[in-house]
Amino acid sequence: HTRGFSASRDELISNDLPSMDAATGEKYVGNSDDSWATRSGFFRVNYSFADRYLLEVNGRYDLSSKFPKDDRSVFSPSFSLGWKLSEESWFKQATNGFFDELKIRASYGSLANQALDNGWYAYLSNYGTGTLGYIMGGKQPQYVLPGGLVSNTVTWEKVTQWDLGLDFVILQNRLKGTFDYYQRKTTDMLGPGRILPNILGMSEPLENAADMVTRGWELALTWNDQLDNGLHYSVGFNLSDTRAEITKYDNPTKSLSSPYYEGQIVGDIWGYESSLFQSADEIASAPDQSKLDGGISKVPGDIRFMDIDGNGVVDYGENTVDKPGDMKIIGNNKARYRYGFNISADWKGFDLGIFFQGVGKRDLMLPYTFKWQYGSMWQVPTAVGNDYWREDNAGGWLPVARFNGSQALGQNQTRYLLDASYLRLKSLSFGYTLPVSLTKQWGIQKCRVYFTGENLLTFKHTPEGFDPELDDPYKYPQQKSLALGLNVVF
């Protein structure tokens, strides 16, 4: 339950008198009073027999005022099973003690989500009120607007997942590993429903509009060892991948204007094959692409779109999956093959830690900031803005400089589809701990000097100014940092 109150007044007489009575302009007063509630119950049961057979059962029941009365409840059960094969005598004999530990796991469960992006009561339509910006009868008239469309059957979004896993330890506890394969089904996804005709004059209501299936796997390996000279070291590696597919959505024509269609791989980028015109002869023999570039009078260096279907016109057809014209899937913006590896070591007081992380595959259409003609001069990194086509730079990345080329440049296309995979030295640390026999003479229990660094190296394919680790290109890139430190314990 939240309550809010606000009051303000224009035309303050003096900044030194921050009082509403010290102003002469209009007064504005507002308040808010919002509330919502949940009611929940849950249970958990754990069972272990001989530290060999493991069982856990969970369940919870939830009610939420965010949904209509008949759709407020949801029950979310889950269970997990584990079997330590390495504790079985017959398995030890069969493997001749090769496995120090081996466990197989299985789990199944569901969760529910009530997070709504458009307010606390998505099934209720609200009126909008305000003051018009013109004068009638000596004063500004008030107005009341009808609310948008709502669904009276909106309810919980549900996620159900099953998982199969394997944990193992071998080679005298030096090599440890885990592997998981999972499938997650999201049903009754909260989002906009089927696209409605523009003549309606309102946007689509929030509905339980779609189902999605996500499949993925995760692998992690760690090696620990100590050499005869006292050097202890550890090396770790992890790798994972996931893909999501829309399995239900009310879009019978599979329109590409809709947010989803059945069979869609989440993150797919539809676009055109493109290059740059290099001569007037290429322009004269090119198919009609006026639907994509606005019919501008083209010159060498302008964007050239490919006529994939060979009909002499470059366009988007009926803008559907089955009739996309010259469009096709040119990439996918979801990160795949996320990986990381770390190294740590210590020897005679010295310690070292290194951590790398990266993404093996990801495609990206950069936003307008990185396309010179589509943004202002203040938005574009110099290295990018200067690399445009001209006679002495026919290999320039951006097209020829012009004031009316934004429509062509704004199309999703292969020329400006970037490889957003990367490898980054995320952190590095190196330190030395002075011998205790020395520090005790100074009344110090421990003394360590160290150096640390973050984001020191990045191997990437994207233009300068864009950080491939960030999902939002407009966020400020992560900064490199260096530090020297001293830890003293008395």
Question: Where are the predicted features?
Answer:
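Short linear motifs in exposed loops
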Residues: 317-318, 355, 401
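Extracytoplasmic gating/loop element in the C-terminal half of outer-membrane beta-barrel translocons
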Residues: 64, 305, 359-448
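Intrinsic-disorder/low-complexity loop/linker signature
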Residues: 25, 309-312, 395, 406, ...
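Glycine-rich, aromatic-lined ligand/substrate-binding cores of catalytic
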Residues: 332-365
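Conserved small-residue
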Residues: 207, 224-333, 373
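Acidic side chains
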Residues: 62, 163, 167, 180, ...
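Short, flexible active-site loops
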Residues: 324-325, 350, 409-414
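Extracellular/periplasmic, surface-exposed regions of secreted and cell-surface proteins
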Residues: 1-271, 408, 412-490
